[in-house]
Protein backbone atom coordinates (compact mmCIF):
# COMPACT_ATOMS: atom_id res chain seq x y z
CA UNK A 1 0.00 0.00 0.00
CA UNK A 2 2.76 2.44 0.87
CA UNK A 3 4.60 1.50 -2.28
CA UNK A 4 1.57 2.38 -4.41
CA UNK A 5 1.32 5.85 -2.81
CA UNK A 6 4.99 6.55 -3.44
CA UNK A 7 4.67 5.53 -7.09
CA UNK A 8 1.70 7.90 -7.57
CA UNK A 9 3.65 10.84 -6.08
CA UNK A 10 6.64 10.15 -8.33
CA UNK A 11 4.37 10.02 -11.38
CA UNK A 12 2.80 13.39 -10.52
CA UNK A 13 6.22 15.00 -10.07
CA UNK A 14 7.34 13.68 -13.45
CA UNK A 15 4.25 15.10 -15.21
CA UNK A 16 4.74 18.51 -13.52
CA UNK A 17 8.38 18.63 -14.62
CA UNK A 18 7.55 17.94 -18.27
CA UNK A 19 4.86 20.67 -18.39
CA UNK A 20 7.20 23.29 -16.88
CA UNK A 21 9.91 22.46 -19.42
CA UNK A 22 7.45 22.91 -22.30
CA UNK A 23 6.38 26.33 -20.97
CA UNK A 24 9.98 27.52 -20.72
CA UNK A 25 10.62 26.36 -24.28
CA UNK A 26 7.61 28.35 -25.45
CA UNK A 27 8.89 31.46 -23.66
CA UNK A 28 12.30 31.11 -25.30
CA UNK A 29 10.76 30.62 -28.72
CA UNK A 30 8.48 33.62 -28.32
CA UNK A 31 11.42 35.84 -27.35
CA UNK A 32 13.49 34.81 -30.36
CA UNK A 33 13.69 37.19 -33.40
CA UNK A 34 12.14 34.65 -35.73
CA UNK A 35 9.05 34.29 -33.58
CA UNK A 36 8.71 38.07 -33.29
CA UNK A 37 8.86 38.43 -37.08
CA UNK A 38 6.20 35.75 -37.46
CA UNK A 39 3.97 37.50 -34.93
CA UNK A 40 4.35 40.91 -36.55
CA UNK A 41 3.77 39.51 -40.03
CA UNK A 42 0.29 38.47 -38.96
CA UNK A 43 -0.53 42.12 -38.02
CA UNK A 44 1.09 43.86 -40.98
CA UNK A 45 -0.87 46.63 -42.65
CA UNK A 46 -0.54 47.92 -46.17
CA UNK A 47 2.70 49.77 -46.98
CA UNK A 48 2.47 53.40 -45.94
CA UNK A 49 -0.57 52.84 -43.76
CA UNK A 50 -0.79 55.40 -40.95
CA UNK A 51 2.12 57.44 -42.31
CA UNK A 52 1.53 61.06 -43.10
CA UNK A 53 4.42 61.38 -45.50
CA UNK A 54 7.37 59.57 -46.93
CA UNK A 55 9.75 61.89 -45.08
CA UNK A 56 10.81 61.60 -41.48
CA UNK A 57 10.97 64.50 -39.08
CA UNK A 58 14.75 64.41 -39.28
CA UNK A 59 14.66 64.67 -43.08
CA UNK A 60 12.13 67.47 -42.83
CA UNK A 61 13.90 69.74 -40.37
CA UNK A 62 17.47 68.92 -41.27
CA UNK A 63 19.31 71.42 -43.46
CA UNK A 64 16.44 73.97 -43.34
CA UNK A 65 18.23 77.30 -43.29
CA UNK A 66 15.18 79.52 -43.89
CA UNK A 67 11.42 79.52 -43.55
CA UNK A 68 11.04 79.42 -47.32
CA UNK A 69 12.95 76.15 -47.52
CA UNK A 70 10.74 74.82 -44.75
CA UNK A 71 7.66 75.81 -46.72
CA UNK A 72 9.09 74.14 -49.81
CA UNK A 73 9.63 70.95 -47.87
CA UNK A 74 6.08 71.14 -46.53
CA UNK A 75 4.86 71.58 -50.09
CA UNK A 76 6.27 68.16 -50.91
CA UNK A 77 3.95 66.65 -48.28
CA UNK A 78 0.77 68.22 -49.56
CA UNK A 79 -1.95 66.33 -51.33
CA UNK A 80 -3.03 66.77 -54.92
CA UNK A 81 -3.01 70.41 -56.03
CA UNK A 82 -6.07 72.22 -54.71
CA UNK A 83 -7.21 69.32 -52.55
CA UNK A 84 -9.37 70.61 -49.69
CA UNK A 85 -8.19 74.16 -50.26
CA UNK A 86 -10.30 77.09 -51.27
CA UNK A 87 -7.42 78.80 -53.06
CA UNK A 88 -4.52 77.49 -55.04
CA UNK A 89 -0.96 78.13 -53.98
CA UNK A 90 0.61 77.99 -50.54
CA UNK A 91 0.57 80.85 -48.11
CA UNK A 92 3.68 82.94 -48.45
CA UNK A 93 4.72 86.42 -47.49
CA UNK A 94 2.25 88.98 -48.84
CA UNK A 95 -0.20 86.35 -50.09
CA UNK A 96 -3.90 86.80 -49.37
CA UNK A 97 -5.94 84.27 -47.44
CA UNK A 98 -9.13 85.36 -49.14
CA UNK A 99 -10.47 83.04 -51.82
CA UNK A 100 -10.38 84.71 -55.18
CA UNK A 101 -13.55 84.73 -57.21
CA UNK A 102 -14.24 86.05 -60.65
CA UNK A 103 -13.96 89.83 -60.94
CA UNK A 104 -17.18 91.49 -59.84
CA UNK A 105 -18.59 88.31 -58.36
CA UNK A 106 -21.37 89.04 -55.87
CA UNK A 107 -21.15 92.77 -56.43
CA UNK A 108 -24.10 94.73 -57.67
CA UNK A 109 -22.11 97.84 -58.52
CA UNK A 110 -18.55 98.84 -59.13
CA UNK A 111 -18.23 101.76 -56.72
CA UNK A 112 -19.34 102.74 -53.24
CA UNK A 113 -20.06 106.33 -52.26
CA UNK A 114 -19.19 107.50 -48.76
CA UNK A 115 -21.40 110.30 -47.47
CA UNK A 116 -20.29 113.03 -45.11
CA UNK A 117 -21.79 111.21 -42.15
CA UNK A 118 -19.69 108.15 -42.95
CA UNK A 119 -22.49 106.01 -44.34
CA UNK A 120 -21.77 104.04 -47.44
CA UNK A 121 -23.93 103.86 -50.49
CA UNK A 122 -23.60 101.31 -53.20
CA UNK A 123 -23.30 102.72 -56.66
CA UNK A 124 -25.11 100.70 -59.23
CA UNK A 125 -24.06 100.43 -62.80
CA UNK A 126 -25.00 103.42 -64.96
CA UNK A 127 -28.59 103.16 -66.07
CA UNK A 128 -29.37 100.40 -63.60
CA UNK A 129 -33.09 100.29 -62.85
CA UNK A 130 -33.93 102.66 -65.66
CA UNK A 131 -36.37 101.50 -68.22
CA UNK A 132 -35.77 101.79 -71.89
CA UNK A 133 -36.82 105.07 -73.52
CA UNK A 134 -40.51 105.04 -74.32
CA UNK A 135 -41.21 102.15 -72.01
CA UNK A 136 -44.83 102.13 -70.89
CA UNK A 137 -45.92 104.50 -73.65
CA UNK A 138 -48.61 103.24 -75.91
CA UNK A 139 -48.50 103.53 -79.62
CA UNK A 140 -49.82 106.79 -81.08
CA UNK A 141 -53.58 106.72 -81.36
CA UNK A 142 -53.93 103.80 -78.98
CA UNK A 143 -57.40 103.71 -77.45
CA UNK A 144 -58.88 105.98 -80.07
CA UNK A 145 -61.70 104.59 -82.09
CA UNK A 146 -61.76 104.70 -85.82
CA UNK A 147 -63.32 107.80 -87.38
CA UNK A 148 -67.09 107.51 -87.52
CA UNK A 149 -67.20 104.72 -84.97
CA UNK A 150 -70.65 104.48 -83.37
CA UNK A 151 -72.32 106.42 -86.12
CA UNK A 152 -75.02 104.67 -88.03
CA UNK A 153 -74.95 104.41 -91.74
CA UNK A 154 -76.60 107.25 -93.62
CA UNK A 155 -80.35 106.72 -93.90
CA UNK A 156 -80.44 104.17 -91.09
CA UNK A 157 -83.84 104.08 -89.39
CA UNK A 158 -85.61 105.83 -92.21
CA UNK A 159 -88.58 104.03 -93.71
CA UNK A 160 -89.39 103.89 -97.30
CA UNK A 161 -91.25 106.93 -98.64
CA UNK A 162 -94.99 106.70 -97.90
CA UNK A 163 -94.54 103.95 -95.33
CA UNK A 164 -97.43 104.00 -92.84
CA UNK A 165 -99.34 106.60 -94.79
CA UNK A 166 -102.59 105.78 -96.52
CA UNK A 167 -103.72 107.53 -99.62
CA UNK A 168 -107.14 109.32 -99.52
CA UNK A 169 -108.73 107.50 -102.46
CA UNK A 170 -107.79 104.02 -101.33
CA UNK A 171 -109.00 104.63 -97.81
CA UNK A 172 -112.45 105.81 -98.90
CA UNK A 173 -112.86 102.93 -101.31
CA UNK A 174 -112.02 100.50 -98.55
CA UNK A 175 -114.67 102.03 -96.28
CA UNK A 176 -117.32 101.83 -99.02
CA UNK A 177 -116.53 98.17 -99.59
CA UNK A 178 -116.88 97.49 -95.89
CA UNK A 179 -120.31 99.23 -95.80
CA UNK A 180 -121.52 97.26 -98.80
CA UNK A 181 -120.41 94.04 -97.17
CA UNK A 182 -122.23 94.83 -93.94
CA UNK A 183 -125.43 95.80 -95.87
CA UNK A 184 -125.31 92.60 -97.86
CA UNK A 185 -124.91 90.59 -94.71
CA UNK A 186 -127.80 92.42 -93.03
CA UNK A 187 -130.16 91.87 -95.99
CA UNK A 188 -129.29 88.18 -96.07
CA UNK A 189 -130.01 87.76 -92.37
CA UNK A 190 -133.31 89.71 -92.68
CA UNK A 191 -134.55 87.56 -95.55
CA UNK A 192 -133.82 84.44 -93.53
CA UNK A 193 -135.84 85.87 -90.63
CA UNK A 194 -138.82 86.60 -92.83
CA UNK A 195 -138.75 83.12 -94.23
CA UNK A 196 -138.50 81.42 -90.90
CA UNK A 197 -140.48 83.71 -88.62
CA UNK A 198 -142.74 85.70 -90.88
CA UNK A 199 -143.49 89.34 -90.59
CA UNK A 200 -144.54 90.12 -87.02
CA UNK A 201 -146.45 93.11 -85.74
CA UNK A 202 -144.81 95.59 -83.39
CA UNK A 203 -141.46 95.20 -84.93
CA UNK A 204 -139.17 98.01 -85.73
CA UNK A 205 -139.81 97.61 -89.43
CA UNK A 206 -139.86 101.38 -90.07
CA UNK A 207 -136.24 101.52 -88.98
CA UNK A 208 -135.23 98.89 -91.55
CA UNK A 209 -134.67 101.07 -94.51
Swiss-Prot record:
This is Cerebral peptide 1. Homodimer; disulfide-linked. Residues 21-43, 53-77, 109-122, 167-191 form a propeptide. Keywords: Amidation, Disulfide bond, Secreted, Signal. Residues 21-39 have a biased composition (Polar residues). It comes from Aplysia californica (California sea hare). The modification Tryptophan amide is found at residues 49, 83, 105, 128, 135, 142, 149, 156, 163. Residues 1-20 form the signal peptide. Disulfide bonds join 172-197. Cerebral peptide 1 is expressed in the cerebral, pedal and buccal ganglia and B1 and B2 neurons. APGW-amide is expressed in buccal ganglia and several neurons.
